[in-house]
Amino acid sequence: MDSPVLQSAYDPSGQYLCYVTVALDKQRVGVQPTQRATSSGVDTVWNENFLYLEDSKLKVTCLKWVNLASSDTVAIILGMNNGEIWLYSVLANEVTYKFTTGNSYEIKDIDLMGNQLWCIDSSDAFYQFDLLQFKLLQHFRINNCVQLNKLTIVPAGDSVAQLLVASHSISLIDIEEKKVVMTFPGHVSPVSTLQVITNEFFISGAEGDRFLNVYDIHSGMTKCVLVAESDIKELSHSGQADSIAVTTEDGSLEIFVDPLVSSSTKKRGNKSKKSSKKIQIVSKDGRKVPIYNAFINKDLLNVSWLQNATMPYFKNLQWREIPNEYTVEISLNWNNKNKSADRDLHGKDLASATNYVEGNARVTSGDNFKHVDDAIKSWERELTSLEQEQAKPPQANELLTETFGDKLESSTVARISGKKTNLKGSNLKTATTTGTVTVILSQALQSNDHSLLETVLNNRDERVIRDTIFRLKPALAVILLERLAERIARQTHRQGPLNVWVKWCLIIHGGYLVSIPNLMSTLSSLHSTLKRRSDLLPRLLALDARLDCTINKFKTLNYEAGDIHSSEPVVEEDEDDVEYNEELDDAGLIEDGEESYGSEEEEEGDSDNEEEQKHTSSKQDGRLETEQSDGEEEAGYSDVEME
């Protein structure tokens, strides 16, 4: 269940709550008291002062309460996504000081003890600041610590000697030696909760997980596992490890009583524990109101929920006295006779017919899509009028200005659609269609509408894709690349068409993408997908070379076989040139001369000098001629006689 509250934290006493919400397209930081001033159940004290961030690109990534020893005042440390750490004074409602890390990497988490402030950024660098002198003391990196999300200080007297950091796994860092001392078993998803509950134990939880692991800092063993009924969002403990309260994703609150005390008598008992108490808040009409944060201290429990979308309300409970399943019934509409005690955003106008309720106002990043349908209908009317104009025959000057490419494109369109169109109408139609696709794409990305996004991505015209991305806002190009990476990773058969969108996003908005800090973490899915696919390129090229080599060998063999077959008819033509005279054979003039002549022809094929050599021929009765000259004379005589 998504909450309008992006960040929230109670002060150490539980009397104030700091929370971060969104007003239009900018974040704002507010602080509200948690105690009721009257017995009527209405919070009469309301702080209307908010710290509005100047730029819509600035985001608060983490926050901590701090008691400044130099001025003896309470302040709030805000970690920003631009690499700065702001010191926000609640009383003055202004930022009194800004720490800087020297780069623009996002601050992931902060923790402080005494006058020391520790933080980590998205480049996995550690920073130590002095809150008295307001300066940076040191910064360093550790090789084995990457993709860090959470940081907490392990108390050791008044000094800080060790740190706990977590990504998917948890590591214990020695500050002096700057190395990993111990590694604890981690979670499948990134760690979102990391707190030290005593000097010997700490607790950790992950995103989208309903399990909390309690570890022994010194031995590294798992003490117990706390199991909630739903995914855990926020955690609060009493400081003595006798009670832990968690808010879950379904809007309930669960309390674990004495989580470190083993109730099993077996030596190898089950280490998992379920919650002892569960609290829910419902309205009088039966609707469930989600709890987004809570603070537990000894016997007192303070729960907070939202009304009118962004207005926090609080209630104190004696949690030890309530039953295991407890439901708090509240009224969402207060009938207050004292209008000065009204908890609406800016009070109520008695002369107004209806009162403004902020929860009914839906604003998404300052863009109003209310008139998108009307705009699309107007564009469709324009397209209809353009098609009517295109049906008219073109003028003479238009025909003269058309190039060969224009005529070719017009003929192609006419062949497909069966209508003749000129270049002017075609360009106007394409431009209007591109504008419509851009509006639909922007709406789909901002509203996270996957079905609407699929209708846009089904477009295969590269020119329309290029013009659409050219008109797209650079900030939305990052979201588009993330959506494309998800589809390429899941649907490999769509990689070709989707690569066209990725290509033009990188070409057109590449300059903006380079200026974004933490680009690797933002587009990590796209980077891993493309890298995994590009790793196959050398193997595919090697396979292509082998296939080319094999095909060339087959072509060579076929060519040689063709030459052999083509040479056979030539030999037959040479044999056809030999004349056979039947009359000479019948007259008995040729007995063995023909054979001698045939043998001479065979020997002449081997060498030009074989005409002068002697040769013998066998007769049918097996006798051999002793003198070759007689045979040659007979052969010559037969030729002369023939002439």
Swiss-Prot record:
Protein's gene: UTP5
Top-rank lineage group of the source organism: Eukaryota
Tell me the GO BP annotations in alphabetical order.
maturation of SSU-rRNA; maturation of SSU-rRNA from tricistronic rRNA transcript (SSU-rRNA, 5.8S rRNA, LSU-rRNA); positive regulation of transcription by RNA polymerase I
Return the similarity comment.
Belongs to the UTP5 family.
Q: Which SUPFAM superfamilies match?
A: WD40 repeat-like
Question: Where are this protein's WD repeats?
Answer: 14-54, 55-98, 186-225, 227-266, 340-389, 471-511
Species = Saccharomyces cerevisiae (strain ATCC 204508 / S288c) (Baker's yeast)
Indicate where this protein resides in the cell.
Nucleus, Nucleolus
Q: What is this protein called?
A: U3 small nucleolar RNA-associated protein 5
Compositional bias (Basic and acidic residues) spans? 612-626
Quaternary structure, per UniProt, is: Interacts with snoRNA U3. Interacts with MPP10. Component of the ribosomal small subunit (SSU) processome composed of at least 40 protein subunits and snoRNA U3. In the absence of snoRNA3, forms a complex with other t-UTPs. This complex can associate with pre-18S ribosomal RNAs.
Sorted alphabetically, the keyword list is: Nucleus, Repeat, Ribonucleoprotein, Ribosome biogenesis, rRNA processing, Transcription, WD repeat
Further comment:
Present with 33100 molecules/cell in log phase SD medium.
